[in-house]
Regions:
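N-terminal disorder-to-order initiation segments that are Gly/Lys/Arg-biased
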Residues: 1-49, 79-82, 86-107
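Short, acidic/charged, Gly/Pro-enriched secondary-structure junctions
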Residues: 53-88
Length: 107
């Protein structure tokens, strides 16, 4: 078993699927992001590590803490929401043939 002592944050993951926005609260995460967001980018750099097999995908939006129950995707942007990031990459990390955590972020 792998121990993640720095994974002490709760985040809310949002994913647009068709016309719906799925929401999932993930506990026991490592989440660090830059406060600065430029108007040209509308994006902030971050890294998220979530122990477990729940999939994270590029394009998912990650909110620091427990986020709103419902959001309007086109208005729920990192430029307007402190603590919100959008994943540019996401990848599973495996150990002994099993997914032990997912890493997502933007560099």
């Amino acid at each position: 078993m792998i121990v993640y002592p720095l994974c002490d944050r709760t985040v809310t993951l949002y994913r647009k699927t068709g016309e719906q926005v799925e929401r999932q609260v993930l506990e026991g995460c490592f989440y660090r992001y830059e406060d600065a967001v430029t108007e040209e980018q509308f994006l902030r750099k971050f890294v998220l590590i979530h122990p477990g097999a729940e999939e994270i995908r590029p394009g998912d939006r990650v909110y620091d803490g427990i986020g709103p129950e419902q959001v309007v995707w086109a208005e729920f942007l990192p430029i307007t929401q402190p603590g919100l990031s959008e994943a540019a990459y996401a990848a599973p990390w495996c150990w002994e043939g099993k997914i032990v955590h997912w890493e997502a972020g933007r560099k």
